[in-house]
Amino acid sequence: MKKCKSFIAAATMSLAFTVSSAWAMPLPLGTDISDRFHGTVHRNDLIATDETYNLPQTNVISFEAGSYSGWHVHGAMTVIGIAGTGLYQERGKEAVLIRPGDVVNIPAGVPHFHGAAKDAPFQQFVIYDSTWKAPEGHAAHTGALTEEQYEEANENAAPSAMQNNDSEFLFGAGMTELTTPNFNSAVYLRKILGTPNAANSPEWVYVAFPAGTYNRWHSHKTGQVLIVTDGIGYHQIKGGALEVLHPGDVVFCPPN
């Protein structure tokens, strides 16, 4: 089989973004799904489960400030905070704040709600088992979240342990520098999702390319999937067209 050789480069990877307005989010919003929620919520489907990459379904969910779901259940899910401030609560447990870089693992079939804090929008990755079906006789509380429950969650949520991000990069807090012959200059890494996790996803590694940085031609035995979060970059399969990448783009490089 012909090897899939590719390279990745950055024209500039220093996207400046803010969350000062209702929808100033780093990744595209996608489809309006507000009819299923309280407030305004969008979903952007990024990765569908298939037999080549064997990855869980992966979407971006964006909540306007004060927007939230009802109590619900689904297959095992892992949430990664992208921007803003979010809330998550399993029924009967303490609510927790979610900030960029926070990871929440949600077991299959556990009733919970999630959404934005009342004074800030929130964007998150959701990685989950889209094939899960509740076992026969599975009992779980579902239904609307009351305003009182939402207010209590806002007032009493456990704080996030995530450190402040003073970097120009989206997941810049806690990055480590990497210098190898594979790159023309230093890149910066941070593991944002380890294994094992609820979604049964491979680990996620955030790689920041400073402006003008690129890697050599290379291939991956098991393939690679890239989700662009910052700035402008380039990707090319050897012999193929050069792709210009923007936040929200997904690149699939097949196994070699």
Model regions and ranges:
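Glycine- and acidic-residue-biased ligand/ion/polar-headgroup-sensing regions
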Residues: 74-92, 221-233, 238-239
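Bacterial N-terminal signal peptides
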Residues: 10-20
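Conserved short histidine dyad/triad with adjacent acidic residue
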Residues: 42, 57-74, 78, 203-220, ...
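A short, N-terminal "cap"/entry segment at the start of jelly-roll beta-barrel domains
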Residues: 22-57, 135-201
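Short beta-strand His + acidic residue motifs that chelate non-heme Fe in jelly-roll/DSBH
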Residues: 69-71, 88-89, 111-118, 215-217, ...
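Short acidic-glycine-tyrosine-enriched beta hairpin
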Residues: 92-109, 239-256
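A short hydrophobic beta-strand segment most commonly corresponding to one strand
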Residues: 119-137, 252
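Bacterial N-terminal signal peptides that target proteins for export
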Residues: 1-11
